[in-house]
From Swiss-Prot:
InterPro entries, alphabetized: EF-Ts_dimer_sf (IPR036402), Transl_elong_EFTs/EF1B (IPR001816), Transl_elong_EFTs/EF1B_dimer (IPR014039), Transl_elong_Ts_CS (IPR018101), UBA-like_sf (IPR009060)
Keyword entries, A-Z: Cytoplasm, Elongation factor, Protein biosynthesis
Regions that span the bilayer: none
Record keyword Cytoplasm present: yes
Descriptive protein name: Elongation factor Ts
GO MF entries: translation elongation factor activity
Domain of life per record: Bacteria
Localization per Swiss-Prot or TrEMBL: Cytoplasm
Keyword Zinc-finger listed: no
Source organism of the structure: Pseudomonas putida (strain GB-1)
Region of interest called Involved in Mg(2+) ion dislocation from EF-Tu, as start-end residue ranges on this chain: 80-83
Family, per entry: Belongs to the EF-Ts family.
Function: Associates with the EF-Tu.GDP complex and induces the exchange of GDP to GTP. It remains bound to the aminoacyl-tRNA.EF-Tu.GTP complex up to the GTP hydrolysis stage on the ribosome.
GO cellular component, one term: cytoplasm
Amino acid sequence: MAAITAALVKELRERTGEGMMDCKKALEKAGGDIEKAIDDMRASGAIKAAKKAGNVAAEGAIAVKTDGKSAVLLEVNSQTDFLALQDDFKNFVAESLEEAFAQKLTDAAPLIASREAAREALVAKCGENVNIRRLVRVEGDVVGAYLHGNKIGAVVVLKGGDVELAKNIAMHVAASNPEFLDSSEISAEAIEREKGVFLQLNADKIAGKPENIVENMINGRITKFKAEASLKEQAFVMNPEVKVGELAKKAGAEIVSFTYFKVGEGIEKPVDDFAAEVAAQVAAAKQ
């Protein structure tokens, strides 16, 4: 019997829209076989149809709340962008955010558990899979947040400065999605990967050139990579003449951390093949 892991329960929950305990029980009964668990749930009437991998909840909304000293950034997923625009979904997100902020939650797990009944009611009403995916809570001397169209959210923690500065830098983070806070955080492995990519892409240009010229070309690319990847080295979106790190320093502030969320980031979305779907339905009808 396969181990009933939290990841397995989560996958079954995402594919069926059922509660965590129901999914765990179904997996235990099926000996850890997720496909058998789905078939058993269908047979028992617990679900109308198996929601296979195609029913991935990869749309949804990002929500954020801050009081200037702390902030919560939350992602809630739906299967379609249409549902994400509906009041029922928006209310679920807003209530979830308020609870997470009031209880100072630092992880999504307790919020998922406490909001399960409300989630199940929403799923039953809308017929779509809905999931609380992740949340982050930050605290600091000064905290600012920015939300772009409910699809991208960012929070920034400063030491010194003010909320307006933190909000402006959060806006920059939302627009630029930096990978690192500053260039010192960039690992040697990341630099080597970038070097390898550069050499592959520029093989024709490099061929036959002296070693010192090639080295200068590589160093130029790495310098540019560090500037593009690190927040402090990026040109500030509201004033490209100034780097973000310089902006903070001039205001007597230090950037402590940043967090960036984008809806569906990292979730593999299925590619719909309408022709194949119709063909499958026709074939099934002939049987």
